[in-house]
Regions:
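Short, solvent-exposed beta-strand/turn "edge" segments of beta-rich domains on protein surfaces
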Residues: 49-54, 112-114
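Oligomerization/assembly interface segments of phage tail-like spikes and tubes
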Residues: 54-68, 117-128
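Mid-chain, well-packed structural core segment of small domains
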Residues: 65-89
Length: 135
């Protein structure tokens, strides 16, 4: 699973005006950034080797960059958190997200230099691994 698959899934929720990957100078309000998690996570492999794995884990950071209202930002953050947390067997391009496990609760990180409130969700996206032909 690629970060772009997660970005497309988050965009399909229809909760933000824009969903992006990577740096976005002069971010408009009501956007969600999707990043690879910078936290360290232990490597796991199935007993018997990677060929026997039925699922994989993609750790992602979601940055909610909303507006100058803390109340509206928190409401949008909770909506995103719940939508992600409740996802089950969700298609994302050519992948299937089996479920999403938040690493911790919704985090308020204050405002950016423009006074726009931001919140962060760290989550593990558990996705199905199949016998797909490798390109």
């Amino acid at each position: 699973m690629m970060l772009s698959d997660i970005r497309d899934y988050i965009a399909s929720l229809g909760l933000a005006d824009s969903v992006y990957i990577g740096p976005l100078p002069d971010k408009p309000e009501k956007t969600i950034g999707v990043y690879n998690s910078k936290h360290q996570h232990e490597y796991k492999v199935a007993v018997g080797g990677p060929q026997l794995e039925s699922y994989g884990t993609k750790y992602v950071t979601l940055l909610l960059h909303w507006n100058k209202s803390q109340r509206e930002t928190e409401k949008a953050g909770k909506s995103l958190f719940e939508a992600v947390r409740r996802s089950r067997n969700t298609p994302a391009n050519n992948e299937t997200i089996k479920f999403t496990l938040p690493v911790y609760d919704l985090q308020d990180i204050g405002t950016d230099d423009s006074g726009v409130y931001e919140m962060v969700i760290e989550a593990a996206f558990i996705y199905e691994k199949g016998n797909k032909d490798e390109e």
